[in-house]
Design a protein with these regions (language model features):
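Short small-residue beta-strand/loop micro-motif enriched in glycine and branched aliphatics
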Residues: 268, 328-329
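DNA target-recognition domains and sequence-specific DNA-contacting regions of bacterial/archaeal
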Residues: 1-98, 147-162, 168-322
Length: 370
């Protein structure tokens, strides 16, 4: 196609969002996905940073995500509230301390090694998650779970019967139930925001999750903390209850259907309908069943400004009732996969903290690379 206008970029460039709130939120990317000599085109709402002679491309990227650079860029924003942009000309003449080229490469090598490990863990987790999803689909959608002889049930001629409520054939002996049968469905609420003592940060309070936290957590399956915690006073103010580790969180509005599994005791705001695995199923089966039902859940959401699924409607959505022995076998198989995914996510959080701790000290020369 033909491109008219926009911003051009190539491999090795750094793309820096220049409009609020993307700049403040750290929206920056290093380009390494194009073919050789291929040119990319994009919006005019980002700045292309291209390394000059004696500037390492990767060092320039890490400089652009450093707190010092970010603070300077934010201070140069102009315009009306909500539509502010960085003054590019002012940014161009800003001064930053730059080490010699060899030091730049050493700094970039250290930080890149951390990011490469994070990327590898993410890739492994994507493949593991695809395996778990495929297993669920194979057993509970295609009905090729292992029969008594260890062969795929439906493909090997296992008896199927038509179920009028589900309007499809299911394995003999299986039935229908409702989403509320997966586990106890719970909601949440928000403490009075004008009372500052209701909230705290830095892990000093109780984890309080919002749909925005799940959005920021996208790509991860598990969640431990949100951006803000609530205090004991906050819990009482909003009559919040703490939900156990293993609770499956599902955002019920703005948007509907973000999922995560709690790795510690926590609570949520009112944007959730979460499932406590206190009945016959564990967190793994609940998670994949909800994931499989998301289209139906979204279709049952209502609202003009934004869609929301109510607890009353959600709990009555009909789902397949499987054989519990098959479910238990599935849960055992998937549990080991999910443990691996969780370990990788924890390692990535630790690596991210290490990178963010090292970054400013390496950039400003507080720490030297030998």
């Amino acid at each position: 196609g033909e491109f008219r206008g926009g911003t051009k970029f190539r491999n090795g460039d750094t793309l820096l969002a220049k409009i609020t709130p993307c700049l403040e939120n750290g929206k920056t990317a290093f380009v390494n996905c194009l073919q050789e000599d291929e040119i990319g085109f994009g919006s005019t709402e980002f700045i292309v940073l291209r390394a000059k002679e004696n500037i390492d491309e990767r060092f320039l990227y890490y400089l652009s995500i450093s707190p010092e650079f970010r603070k300077q860029a934010i201070s140069l924003m102009e315009g009306t509230s909500g539509r502010k942009r960085v003054n590019e000309n002012a940014l161009k003449i800003s001064d930053f301390l730059i080490p010699d080229f060899e030091e730049q490469k050493k700094i970039a090598n250290i930080l890149s090694a951390i990011d490469d490990k994070i990327s590898l863990n993410n890739q492994i987790n994507q493949e593991l998650e695809a395996m778990a999803k495929t297993l669920y689909d194979y057993w509970f959608v295609q009905f090729d779970f292992p029969d008594q002889n260890g062969k795929p049930y439906k493909s090997s001629g296992g008896k199927m019967v038509y179920h009028p409520e589900l309007k499809r054939e299911i394995p003999e002996g299986w039935g229908v139930e409702k989403l509320e049968d997966l586990g106890t469905i719970v909601g949440g609420s928000t403490p009075t925001k004008s009372i500052s003592d209701n909230f705290t940060k830095g892990g000093e309070g109780y984890s309080w999750i919002t749909p925005n936290d799940l959005s920021n957590n996208k790509g991860n399956k598990f969640i431990k903390n949100g951006e803000i915690d609530v205090t004991v006073r906050g819990l009482k103010d909003a009559s919040l209850k703490l939900y156990p580790e293993g609770t499956v969180l599902m955002s019920s509005r703005a948007p509907v259907g973000y999922l995560a599994i709690a790795t510690k005791e926590l609570t949520t705001n009112q944007g959730f309908k979460s499932f406590i695995p206190d009945k016959k199923y564990d967190k793994n089966y609940i998670y994949y069943t909800l994931q499989n039902c998301l289209k139906v859940i979204e279709q049952n959401a209502s609202g003009s400004t934004f869609k929301e699924i109510s607890a009353t409607v959600l709990k009555d959505i009909k789902i397949l009732q499987p054989n519990l022995e098959i479910v238990k076998k599935f849960e055992i198989k998937v549990s080991s996969i999910n443990n691996y995914i969780r370990d990788n996510e924890v390692q990535n959080q630790e690596l991210t903290q290490l990178r963010d701790w090292l970054l400013p000290m390496l950039i400003n020369g507080q720490v030297k690379v030998e």
